[in-house]
């Protein structure tokens, strides 16, 4: 998804910076370079990229990776960054290649949270103390598909298992068409200080073509 990012309490001062330039000269566009780069690849929206999530990576290897962090003094000193995927959408945007489930049944989110709670418990059990978290991002899908009660439950689960830093960056993807009354106040009270608002295109014809009707007044 493409987003317009709004950050509370953050100012871009890059234009006024006295820091030395880190610009790198553009490579020469040779036929050999174009031939090497003109190949398909995964959508680079996250790391590791989607093609790295394969069945060959077993549960045992995942536990081993957690164990390496648990026993490594240097790794334990570094805070975690958490990503929680909320896959539900009331309708599908035709351009989207994210993992999603189209439904209007809010009850499905309760079942999803049940399983997510079990996964959080499994991860927490690998650490002797609550791991420190410096970043949290809720993505989707549509995180604002969750009711306020479901969102509170999710955050309670996370904060019970992890120790969030007081200055943690907590961000959430918001669909302004799917925003419950009081949701913004709830998220602010829970420490969220950054939100990404989906604005794919303001042209009504394009919105119709991609099945995402979002008038400017809604945005």
Task: Give a label for each model feature.
Residues 100-129, 133-219:
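Conserved non-cysteine loop/helix-boundary elements of the Radical SAM core domain that shape
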Residues 84-100:
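Local cysteine-cluster metal-coordination motifs and their immediate loop/turn environment
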Residues 34, 41-44, 50, 85, ...:
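Generic secondary-structure boundary/loop-capping signal
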Residues 81-83, 171:
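Short aromatic/hydrophobic contact patches that present stacked aromatics
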Residues 1-80:
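Flexible, acidic/Gly-rich N-terminal and inter-domain linker regions that tether
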């Amino acid at each position: 998804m493409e987003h317009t990012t709004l950050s509370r309490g953050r100012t871009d001062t890059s234009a006024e910076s006295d820091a030395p330039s880190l610009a790198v000269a553009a490579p020469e566009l040779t036929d050999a370079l174009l031939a090497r780069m003109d190949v398909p690849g995964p959508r680079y929206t996250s790391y590791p990229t989607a093609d790295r999530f394969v069945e060959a990576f077993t549960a045992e290897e995942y536990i081993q990776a957690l164990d390496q962090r648990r026993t490594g003094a240097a790794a334990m000193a570094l805070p975690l960054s958490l990503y929680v995927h909320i896959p539900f959408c009331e309708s599908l945007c035709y351009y989207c290649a994210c993992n999603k489930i189209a439904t209007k049944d809010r009850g499905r989110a309760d079942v999803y949270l049940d399983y997510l709670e079990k996964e959080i418990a499994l991860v927490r059990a690998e650490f002797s103390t609550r791991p420190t978290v410096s970043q949290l991002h809720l993505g989707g899908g549509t995180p604002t598909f969750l009711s306020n009660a479901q969102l509170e439950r999710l955050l309670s689960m996370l904060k019970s298992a992890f120790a969030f830093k007081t200055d943690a960056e907590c961000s959430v993807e918001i669909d302004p068409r799917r925003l419950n009354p009081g949701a913004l106040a709830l998220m602010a009270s829970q420490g969220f200080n950054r939100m990404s608002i989906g604005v794919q295109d303001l042209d009504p014809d394009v919105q119709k073509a991609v099945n995402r009707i979002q008038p400017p007044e809604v945005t």
